Amino acid sequence: METRARKFSSSIHNWYLQNGRKNLPWRKNITPYRVWISEIMLQQTQVKTVIPFYKKFMLRFPNLKAISEATEEEILALWTGLGFYRRAKNIYATKEIIKNKYKNKFPSNFDDLIKLPGIGKSTAGAILSIAYKKPAPILDANVKRVISRHDDIDLQDKKSLANLWHMSETYTPSKKIFEYTQGIMDVGAIICSNKNPMCSDCPLTSSCKTAFKELKIVNKSKRQKRKEKLFFTLAHSKSEFLLFRKNAKTYWESLWIPYEDKNELSNTIFKEPIHSDTKKFKHALSHLDLEITINIFDYKAPFAIETNLEHQWIKKSDIHKYGLPKPIKNIIESHV
């Protein structure tokens, strides 16, 4: 097994030197901080989607010192459109721990990393192996696919996750870990793709147990996404929008949204507008299909409302400083 493991890791290493995606922005000027942000952004999100968000984030917060004084609001604002906003809240929580407990020094051992919000076993492994060049296994979606096919591990087996971690640990080399870790992620992303793997170009073809074989298509019972209707009232004057912070622990938590009505006819806290309009559209979340209706009310000037909900009249020129769900931001920007 040792010889097979060595062959596996050296094949990945050599392939990466020739074919790796070295131009990805998080693979330049590598620091633990930069690796951490990229790994969090890449959770459940494609590389091409992450790149512009990562670049924008790094311009605003290029290092731990820069982000140390950031508010949660500032981080959420930069996250608008990337989705899975819990990740942004975890970044805020983690940077606070690093600032207060570790004095702005990024942890460099597994036990400390794994305790930080949003950092699991695989993310900790990526930070250790890429930023610190310490041998540590990873098992993101791409690596899981490579190893499961290479060793013909049935992903439907209840023991598959434990087996995959065991093999990932076995294949992880003690040297040249930096190239290996990025290489196996790249092989999974570029070569051993989900539907059309390019076995002829794969560095692991000679030892892969499923190379050139027909893929096993697992017919998972696709869970029907729940549908939900949302009704909002967006009040705005010539220079400001009235927005409310969503405090419920659900999707869009802590983001700013228009007043959420219980139903289409429940606009009880607003006075008569000088003009009104209604927009209807659909928006898909990973687990939910939303049907959104927004009543847009125009007023001459901001006004006080009677509510215990956290709310604020926000200047149109300051909207970019607040975290908003993408569909809400699109509606607002169309009225700026």
Model feature map: region roles:
Residues 1-22, 28, 189-336:
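Intrinsically disordered, low-complexity, charged terminal extensions of DNA damage-control enzymes
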Residues 3-6, 10-198, 204-207:
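Catalytic cores of DNA base-excision repair glycosylases
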